Every structure is written in structure tokens, then in C-alpha cells.
Amino acid sequence: MNVISKLAHVDPTAKIGDNVIIEPFVYIEGNVEIGDGCHIRPNAVIRSGARIGANNHIFEGSIIAATPQDFRWNGEESFVIIGDNNTIREHVIINRSSHRDGATRIGSNSFIMAQTHIGHDCHIGNYCVLGTAVKVAGDVSIGNYTILSSNALVHERCDVGDVCLIKGGCRVNSHVPPFTIMAHNPIEYKGINSFVLRKIGKSEATIDEIASAYRHLYHSNTSTYNALRRIEVDVEDSPEKTAIIKFLKDHKLTVAAVPLDLEGD
């Protein structure tokens, strides 16, 4: 049974699942879908285009599917699609896509802390943590099991791979390859995210091979092209090696924290 406060505004066309709690002063527009078991706290705003899965907990003052902060947007219908089992804390803003029928996507089982901003057309993976006051610009992709610590900034159109750790206050201005730790401003490579790799069941041998790959990239004083060739030859084959090589190739060897004079070939 749903518990919907009489002091909340819920558009009659909004689709609300079962066992949903909607507290006073929540504002829910039309063209909204909210899955089973969600809990929406006071003063949250769920705007047109929100597609929210099951068992999400949305705290006070958050705005889901805010209109995109993008001069290209001309009022087209677009969406925010959120998976299941996420916690979205106070005053989080998630903008919908700036493209017709496009979507900003949030996966499942993530924790988005207070005052975080997620721009238009972002894709946030599963099991992510975004710390307090993280700012993610438009068209950013964040991989699974990645942590962005408080006050981290991610520039538009940057991709952050799986199982990364971006430390507090770090400014990400290029693509961050998977399994790495980045810190500071300007951004610096600080090793691999071995703690979370162990948490998700990666073996010590696998972790050592990941570390070996990134020694070629960040500690060999060679170009990213040569580092890629060395990784292909020297590192044992594994899904993680494949993911690293694919990321480097997909981003044309342009990755964060590599000195400009060592980029490319």
C-alpha cells in the first residue's frame, strides 16, 4: 500500500508503483514513473521525464529530471532513467538529456551524496559512490564500482572507467582509465584501486598484473603508444588487460595524468 501525504503534489498521470512513500511537499509532475518501494522525502521534485526504478530513496530537496543546462536544448522530450536500490541524498540535482528521446542514466545500487550535480546525458554505472558536492558535467560516463570523493569535479565529455577512485577535490579534465586512483589539481596518477578490486573478488595475481600495466603507462617515461605496445606484450591476458587496452584505444591514447609531451606516438 502506498503512503502519499495529502500535502504532496502528485500529477494524476504520474505512474506510481506499490509500497511507495511520498512525504509532505514533494512535487511530482506528469510523465513520471516511480517503481515499487521508493521513498521520496519532503521538498523533493520529480520532473517530467523521470523514470525511477524500485527501492530508491530520494532525500529532501533533490531534483530529478531537471531541465538540461545546455544551450542546445530546445524543449525536446528527454529523460532521466534511474535503476534500483539507489540512495540519493539531500539537494542532489540530476539533469535530463539535452537530446530528443535521449536519457541521463543512473545505474543500480549506488550512493549519491548531498549537493551533488549530475549533468545532462551522463551515464553513471552500478555500485558507484559520489561523495558530497561532486560536480559531474554533461556527457560524462562513470564506470561501475567507481568512487568520486567529495568535491571532485569531472569536466564535460570525460569518461571514468570501472573501479576507479577519484580523490577529494580532484579535477578530472581527461579520460581516467579503469582501476586507477587519481588525485589533486592538476590531476595525478596515484596507483591502482586495489582495495575495491579485492572487495569485488579480484585475485592478488590479477591486481599485480593491473599494476604492471599502469607502470608501463605512468612510470616508464615513454609515450602512451609505446606503453600500449608494452602492455599488449608484457602483461598476462585477462579481462582486466582487455579492458585497459580497449579503454586506451577507444580514447585514442588520450588519458588523464599523462604529460602532454608523452601523449600519442
Predicted feature residues:
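Terminal amphipathic alpha-helical/low-complexity segments used for targeting or macromolecular assembly
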Residues: 1-7, 12-13, 18-19, 55, ...
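Structural signal for interior beta-strand "rungs" in well-ordered beta-sheet cores
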Residues: 3-183, 187-188
